[in-house]
């Protein structure tokens, strides 16, 4: 019997303190980044990715709703409207799982911790549907993914290659989970990733750390307005 002998699980901060870890004093040259990475958004080779803007993550009061969800929707719609008006492909990615979670693998174990049993993203369920205030259209492209990373187990890369896409604008929820893992995989597949920081949200407290990580190692971090300005400047 465990009784009162069960130990409290240490937090990451407590573990770091235990091994005397402190972050290194690293400075990233953002000015140099602007010089060497100015042309990541070529409009004719760019697509807009909108990741997991489903009711489960966006609807106020939902089990995994991002607190900044309403503001994120506004910024995503600005990008969607601009891209549609300028023939830039818009791709809506939706987490899609079996009702029993049998296709989720290891993710199913974590899901039991994160959300209640009735929050499975089964196709056609309320939580699975895109948030109704988004400006999606039937003529847009829709991709279903079974796990966090939108490239895993989906036809996303095949769609992008067939369209001749080289640069990807990332938006959606959660910044530090599905958006983040997809962006890193995109980088390793030699796509140029740009993330619209105000068009992404999260129910978790790690957005700032993920943003710094992306900006340092994987791609560019801009606002929706800055991305639109670059697209306008580079338009043929």
Report the location of each language-model feature:
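A short alpha/beta connector and helix-capping loop motif
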Residues: 44, 62-83, 87-92
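Acidic-leg catalytic submotif of subtilisin-like serine proteases
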Residues: 47-57
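Short, conserved beta-strand edge motifs with alternating hydrophobic and charged residues
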Residues: 50, 91-94, 144-145
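Short acidic/His/Gly/Ser-rich catalytic and metal-binding motifs that mark active-site loops
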Residues: 56-59, 100-102
């Amino acid at each position: 019997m465990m009784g009162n002998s069960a130990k409290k699980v240490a937090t990451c901060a407590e573990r770091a303190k235990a091994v005397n870890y402190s972050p290194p004093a690293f400075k990233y040259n953002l000015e140099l980044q602007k010089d060497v990475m100015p042309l990541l958004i070529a409009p004719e080779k760019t697509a807009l990715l909108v990741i997991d803007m489903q009711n489960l993550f966006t609807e106020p009061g939902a089990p995994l709703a991002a607190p900044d969800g309403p503001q994120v929707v506004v910024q995503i719609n600005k990008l969607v409207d601009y891209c549609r008006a300028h023939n830039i492909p818009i791709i809506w990615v939706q987490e899609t799982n079996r009702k029993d979670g049998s296709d989720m693998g290891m993710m199913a174990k974590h899901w039991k911790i994160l959300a209640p049993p009735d929050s499975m993203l089964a196709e056609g369920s309320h939580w699975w549907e895109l948030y109704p205030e988004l400006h999606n259209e039937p003529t847009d492209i829709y991709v279903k993914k079974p796990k966090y990373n939108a490239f895993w187990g989906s036809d996303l890369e095949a769609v992008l290659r067939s369209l001749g896409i080289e640069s990807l604008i990332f938006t959606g929820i959660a910044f530090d989970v599905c958006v983040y893992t997809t962006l890193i995989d995109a980088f390793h597949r030699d796509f140029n990733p740009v993330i619209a920081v105000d068009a992404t949200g999260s129910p978790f407290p790690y957005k700032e750390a993920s943003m710094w990580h992306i900006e340092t190692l994987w791609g560019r971090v801009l606002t929706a307005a800055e991305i639109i300005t670059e697209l306008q400047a580079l338009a043929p």
